């Protein structure tokens, strides 16, 4: 069980020393469990690149390669790691790289390649593996695989749905080869392109994470990789190229009207840095009237950042700049729980294989929860899903067989040292506690860590935001330690 301990004392100097030891910015004692190692025997899948779908106690996902035909797989696994099975081996090398969406007992998704022109497709299938149907095949591009067409090419963002219509993005293709936003009914009818991104005019190219950050400018953005967010009749998304320099955040209506750029990301200098981030590869996360996202480049160290802005485009704030030591190049959408954001980076951290992190929505208390390495997996390419207090995701590489893993991270409650509630207030010593919503937390205390006799002094339930704990008895002790436990 993860334990957070703090010492309260009459002397502030003692506080500072003990807090810096006990509550640093790395919290590696989270419980990380590998549920499945890909790349094993029996034509197993390889390289899971997409988000998982949770239905009850069952997780569904895809791999980009492997399977009987080498074209990737669709799999299921229970949240306790049992019941792993491939429910579909894909043919013709379609390589699914976008997350699926579940409606009833039907899964809907996209493939990056495959289809009649090998430019990707939209499919559906039942959760038992039956009824696989190709709903749309993206058309041929001229003059080459990365040329132009009418409907888009190479979809890899997650689909979203209002129940009867699916919405998604294609990175390439369209009339200017800068990608499209499309919609299609769940029965395969009514496919329509509702946005074609305009032509870009080439400027100075810069490189971040071995990819071009600036491939030209236009007014509306270019190359949408991430999935969309649907709120009522409004879609929100990102492009990692175009705009005035390095991508945009946009909003539009589901009928294709009202396209608006909410944020233009600025240019980067010769060493890849700027003030607001560059190249948002991932999709957005919506919380109330606020959008949260990440960029893969730019920021103060050229390693990307975490940002937020209002749904009307106002109030852009850089919440955190990655420094490589705490992670680098975040490529996946954030997961929001209460007032805490959880996410991953593709590189950086102690082993340079990426990290799992948490941060409050106000930018406080950034914490590294897990450093990836070859044994536990590397290159996390999925947004989290939550069950109880466990975050589930996939890693595209590493693990026992080198084919990536499905993992679960048990998130323990955290004591927040970076906000204004930490310390002595109204003659009581107190602090904020954060964690997964509806998680019960017991605060225990003792006076001697050499022979601790931990006593429970309060139980709280986390409900959508930090819970404040205060100890009015702190002045009765020369020193007091605190820790958090589950009941």
PLM-predicted stretches and their roles:
Residues 5, 411-487:
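Short, composition-biased motifs enriched in small/polar/acidic residues
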Residues 2-420, 425, 436, 466:
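Extracellular beta-propeller repeat domains
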């Amino acid at each position: 069980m993860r334990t957070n301990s703090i010492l309260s004392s009459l002397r502030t100097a003692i506080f500072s020393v003990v807090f810096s030891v006990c509550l640093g910015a790395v919290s590696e004692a989270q419980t990380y469990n590998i549920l499945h190692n890909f790349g094993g025997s029996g034509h197993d899948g390889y390289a899971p690149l997409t988000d998982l779908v949770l239905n009850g106690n069952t997780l569904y996902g895809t791999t980009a390669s492997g399977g009987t035909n080498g074209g990737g797989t669709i799999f299921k696994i229970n949240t306790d790691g049992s019941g792993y099975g491939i429910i579909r081996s894909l043919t013709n090398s379609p390589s699914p790289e976008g997350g699926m969406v579940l409606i009833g007992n039907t899964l809907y998704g996209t493939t990056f390649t495959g289809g009649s022109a090998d430019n990707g497709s939209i499919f559906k299938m039942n959760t038992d593996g039956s009824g696989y149907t190709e709903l749309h095949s993206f058309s041929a591009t001229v003059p080459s695989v990365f040329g132009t067409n009418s409907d888009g090419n190479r979809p890899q963002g997650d689909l979203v749905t209002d129940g009867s219509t699916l919405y998604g993005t294609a990175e390439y293709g369209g009339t200017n080869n800068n990608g499209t936003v499309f919609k299609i009914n769940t029965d395969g009818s009514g496919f329509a392109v509702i946005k074609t991104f305009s032509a870009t005019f080439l400027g100075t190219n810069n490189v971040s994470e071995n990819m071009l950050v600036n491939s030209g400018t236009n007014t509306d953005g270019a190359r949408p990789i991430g999935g969309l967010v649907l709120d009522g009749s409004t879609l929100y998304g990102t492009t990692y190229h175009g705009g005035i320099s390095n991508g945009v955040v946009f909003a539009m209506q589901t009928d294709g009207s009202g396209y608006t750029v909410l944020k233009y990301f600025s240019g980067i200098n010769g060493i890849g840095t700027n003030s607001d981030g560059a190249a948002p590869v991932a999709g957005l996360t919506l919380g109330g009237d606020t959008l949260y996202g990440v960029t893969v480049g730019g920021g103060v160290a050229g390693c990307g950042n975490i940002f937020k802005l209002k749904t009307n485009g106002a109030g852009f704030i850089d919440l955190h700049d990655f420094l490589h030591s705490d992670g680098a190049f975040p490529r996946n959408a954030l997961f929001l729980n209460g007032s805490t954001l959880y996410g991953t980076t593709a590189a950086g951290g102690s082993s340079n294989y990426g990290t799992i992190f948490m941060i409050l929505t106000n930018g406080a208390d950034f914490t590294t929860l897990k450093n990836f390495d070859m044994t536990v997996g590397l290159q996390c390419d999925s947004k989290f899903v939550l069950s109880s207090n466990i975050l589930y995701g996939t890693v595209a590489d590493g693990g026992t067989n080198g084919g990536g893993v499905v993992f679960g991270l048990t998130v323990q409650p955290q004591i927040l040292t970076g906000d204004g509630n930490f310390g002595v207030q109204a003659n009581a010593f107190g602090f904020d506690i954060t964690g997964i919503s509806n998680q019960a937390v017991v605060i225990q205390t003792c006076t001697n860590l050499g022979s601790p006799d931990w006593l429970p002094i309060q139980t709280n339930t986390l409900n959508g935001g930090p819970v404040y704990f205060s100890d009015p008895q702190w002045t009765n002790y020369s020193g007091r330690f605190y820790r958090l436990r589950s009941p």
